[in-house]
């Protein structure tokens, strides 16, 4: 697994794919530029993942493409390699535009493009909000082969005529379900109308609801489809648990007990609102726990600094809103805690996908109040999975506020209350194992913690 992709999971993955799509088993079979191949191998890839082996050739042919695959299967590299194959680095003009829903993701994509194109003298700029407009203008006027950005700032630079669009041949929508949501939809259309009529469109995401797929017909022509079935989206190697917490105010003490008990490499804790992130961060620090936090209202410099510390391992626990749920890779994250269950079921898989990246083992723990039972059941039905109650042992793992009475009993009823087609994706469902023992077995004695 030197290239960071779980090949066992890849082999089991089934694609609902257009009939004309063929599989390229190696990068050499894709007839890529020699300097691009050098960059791919230097980046650590040895052979293409399932989505890469199907999508790269089609994108390089100029076909509009819809690619949906699990988190951590190399989607970013899929379109980055394709972009680097089709651009002309002699021409100092923007030829590919990548739009992302968050600034951090846009910056990460820029890093991937630069790394893969290390031997090609490629220029790629991250055009994102919250940064110095003058720097954007200077970089864009100088000429960039690829621009990775957020819709608002990109649209602004196009309107100001600093981002020249006449040579753009490819538009990539990363995390397309979020971009085509109401919050970004008009901005995407605003950008699209400035592009040349023949611009190729590539749509990429881990989740693509039917209404989003239907919407793509407005700006895509006869697209090639590479789609993973929805019930195969739950991540391989990622164990999902719930903890029944009858009252909202008991969540904090439960979290403190988890923090005291587990040993992890790095963890992300998700809350649904910025106010909750700030409140929980303050409470954890008051209790002498070392945590960092991030949400969309923070200045971009502060967000960049927090991200850098977290990537470098200087910060171990990050509390965040869904701004961190989309596509961001920190390979040492092994635990995700949903302090609040996401109100949008598509966001669930994006959140838990921050753990167990690139085929590593990971754990997702969901705090569930009586008001969240419907949401939990909806997630199980939607992804055809079963989320088990977290095993515990009084001597090894003790919650001071063990609220497992009626709610826990209801949640752990017989499987007759669950859909018959649900399958359990787990390493072990034997509840007599203690949770620390499960982690030890699952991670082969790799510490996962604080």
UniProtKB/Swiss-Prot annotation:
Catalytic activity: ATP + H2O = ADP + phosphate + H(+)
Alphabetical UniProt keywords: ATP-binding, Helicase, Hydrolase, Nucleotide-binding, Nucleus, Ribosome biogenesis, RNA-binding, rRNA processing
All residue ranges annotated as the Helicase ATP-binding domain in the record: 56-226
Limits of the Helicase C-terminal domain: 237-398
Highest taxon listed in the record's lineage: Eukaryota
SMART domains the record matches: DEXDc (SM00487), HELICc (SM00490)
One of the Pfam families matching this protein, by short name: Helicase_C
Motif placement: DEAD box: 174-177
Entry EC number(s): 3.6.4.13
Subcellular location: Nucleus, Nucleolus
Broad enzyme group: hydrolase
Free-text note on domains in this protein's UniProt record: The Q motif is unique to and characteristic of the DEAD box family of RNA helicases and controls ATP binding and hydrolysis.
Job description of the protein: ATP-dependent RNA helicase involved in 40S ribosomal subunit biogenesis. Required for the processing and cleavage of 35S pre-rRNA at sites A0, A1, and A2, leading to mature 18S rRNA.
Family from the record: Belongs to the DEAD box helicase family. DDX48/FAL1 subfamily.
Protein name: ATP-dependent RNA helicase FAL1
Taxonomic lineage of the native organism: Eukaryota, Fungi, Dikarya, Ascomycota, Pezizomycotina
Underlying gene: FAL1
């Amino acid at each position: 697994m030197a290239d960071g992709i779980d090949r066992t999971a890849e082999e089991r993955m089934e694609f609902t794919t257009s009939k004309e799509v063929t599989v390229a088993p190696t990068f050499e079979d894709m007839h890529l530029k020699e300097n691009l191949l050098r960059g791919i191998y230097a980046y650590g890839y040895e052979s293409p993942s399932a989505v890469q082996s199907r999508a790269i050739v089609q994108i390089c042919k100029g076909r509009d493409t819809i690619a949906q695959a699990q988190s951590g299967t190399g989607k970013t590299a899929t379109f980055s390699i394709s972009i680097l194959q089709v651009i002309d680095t002699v021409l100092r003009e923007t030829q590919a535009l990548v739009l992302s829903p968050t600034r951090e993701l846009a910056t990460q994509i820029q890093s991937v493009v630069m790394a893969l194109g290390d031997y090609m003298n490629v220029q790629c700029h991250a055009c994102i909000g919250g940064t110095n407009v003058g720097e954007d203008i200077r970089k864009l006027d100088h000429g960039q082969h690829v621009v990775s950005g957020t819709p608002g700032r990109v649209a602004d630079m196009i309107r100001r005529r600093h981002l020249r669009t006449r040579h753009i041949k490819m538009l990539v929508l990363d995390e397309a379900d979020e971009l085509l949501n109401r919050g970004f939809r008009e901005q995407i259309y605003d950008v699209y109308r400035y592009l040349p009529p023949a611009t190729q469109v590539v749509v990429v995401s881990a989740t693509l609801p039917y209404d989003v797929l239907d919407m793509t017909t407005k700006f895509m022509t006869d697209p090639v489809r590479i789609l993973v079935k929805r019930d195969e989206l739950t991540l391989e190697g990622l164990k999902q648990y719930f903890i029944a917490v009858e009252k909202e105010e008991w969540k904090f003490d439960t979290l403190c007990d988890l923090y005291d008990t587990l040993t992890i490499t790095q963890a992300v804790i998700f809350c649904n609102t910025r106010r909750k992130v700030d409140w929980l961060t303050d409470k954890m620090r008051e209790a002498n726990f070392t945590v960092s936090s991030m949400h969309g209202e923070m200045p971009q410099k502060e967000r960049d600094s927090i991200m850098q510390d977290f990537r470098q391992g200087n910060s171990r626990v990050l509390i965040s809103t869904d701004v961190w749920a989309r596509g961001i890779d920190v390979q040492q994250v092994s635990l995700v805690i949903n302090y609040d269950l996401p109100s949008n079921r598509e966001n669930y898989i994006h959140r838990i996908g921050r753990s167990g990246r690139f085929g590593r083992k990971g754990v997702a723990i969901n705090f569930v109040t009586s008001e969240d039972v419907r949401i939990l059941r909806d997630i199980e039905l939607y992804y055809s999975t079963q989320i088990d109650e977290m095993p515990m042992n009084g001597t090894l793992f003790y919650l001071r506020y063990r609220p497992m009475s009626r709610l826990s009993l209801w949640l752990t009823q017989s499987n007759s209350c669950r859909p018959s087609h649900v399958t359990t994706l787990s390493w072990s469902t034997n509840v007599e194992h203690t949770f620390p023992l499960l982690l030890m077995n699952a991670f082969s004695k790799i510490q996962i913690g604080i």
